Design a protein with these regions (language model features):
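Conserved small/polar residues in nucleotide/adenosyl-binding loops
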Residues: 242-249
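Membrane-interface helix termini and inter-helical loops of multi-pass transporters
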Residues: 3-10, 176-185
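Cytosolic, membrane-interface loops and tails of multi-pass inner-membrane proteins
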Residues: 35-45, 204-225
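N-terminal transmembrane signal-anchor/hairpin module of polytopic inner-membrane proteins
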Residues: 1-140
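Membrane-embedded alpha-helical segments that form the functional core of polytopic membrane enzymes
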Residues: 71-83, 186-199, 258-259
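Hydrophobic alpha-helical transmembrane segments in multi-pass integral membrane proteins
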Residues: 64-68, 115-125, 166-179, 237-241
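Small-residue-rich segments of transmembrane alpha-helices in multi-pass membrane proteins
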Residues: 53-61, 102-115, 156-170, 225-237
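Transmembrane alpha-helical segments that form the membrane-embedded catalytic/substrate-channel core
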Residues: 138-139, 166-171, 196-207
Length: 259
């Protein structure tokens, strides 16, 4: 896999090639296992696992493509992802007619937040939504003059921004991080490694849930999620992260000794 990627992308650093190889290798392995299970035992119900694998192929392809086509496209891609999440939460939770103006300001916060990430202006990036927008949005709601249910709207809108924009925008900020000496993958490598860890966590939660799952977390919301699967996935992913070489480890390993 690494040799093939070296031929296709000769300018990629070794760290990036390793991360991409891990992501593609895991997906290829999962696809082969599903293919063999269908051939050996056609009656086995693997529809859920097949859907997960297809989703991960799409997500991994989009992330890898966005990262390597252009840095600018990566920022736009992640901003669009935030917009989709914001719109989904807005449509599910439901708001008053009087909240439309504040929702518009919430949408306007998305390009501003990602532009701050693009500039790597950490001081403004880290306070824009949890401080500035937390003051602007309630003010906009109050100025509308309709105070019925305003407290609920304030809380929902602020935390929709935190979840869908502030949280996801940290992925974009990874792209703006300066390269470390001895770690040539830069922010792109960190972002793709995070995608790989998320993929591993999803797989391990599914496996542990099938093996040991007894106690459901939210039966009415997600009946297939269990505490055993959740804890098994978190512990497995943490162990993998702890044993994997970090940028600091790579930098130290390549630094010349003082002897």
């Amino acid at each position: 896999m690494k040799e093939l990627l070296d031929i296709i992308f000769p300018t990629l650093s070794d760290e990036l090639i390793i991360v991409i190889s891990l992501i593609i290798g895991l997906l290829v392995t999962a696809s082969l296992i599903l293919f063999l299970v269908k051939k050996i035992s056609p009656k086995t119900n693997i529809s859920e696992l097949s859907a997960r694998t297809r989703s991960w192929w799409i997500m991994a392809g989009m992330f890898i493509g966005a990262v390597f086509i252009s840095y600018n496209i990566s920022y736009f891609f992640l901003a669009f992802l935030s917009f989709i999440a914001f719109r989904e939460l807005y449509s599910v939770l439901g708001f008053r007619e009087a909240d439309r103006g504040a929702l518009f300001w919430g949408i306007l916060a998305i390009p501003i937040q990602y532009y701050l990430a693009y500039l790597a202006w950490y001081g403004a990036f880290i306070i824009f939504i949890p401080v500035v927008m937390f003051l602007v949005l309630p003010l906009r709601l109050v100025l509308k003059g309709d105070t019925h249910g305003i407290t609920k709207s304030m809380a929902l809108l602020q935390w929709i921004l935190m979840l869908s924009v502030f949280g996801i925008s940290h992925l974009a900020y990874l792209l703006s991080l300066p390269e470390l000496p001895g770690f040539n993958a830069g922010g792109r490598g960190l972002l793709l490694f995070l995608v790989f860890l998320t993929e591993i966590n999803d797989v391990m939660q599914f496996i542990w849930g099938k093996l040991l799952g007894r106690h459901k977390i939210l039966p009415k919301v997600s009946p297939n999620k269990t505490w055993e699967g959740f804890l098994g996935g978190v512990i497995s992913t943490t162990c993998l992260l702890y044993t994997s070489p970090s940028p600091r480890d790579m930098r130290r390993s390549r630094m010349p000794s003082s002897a």
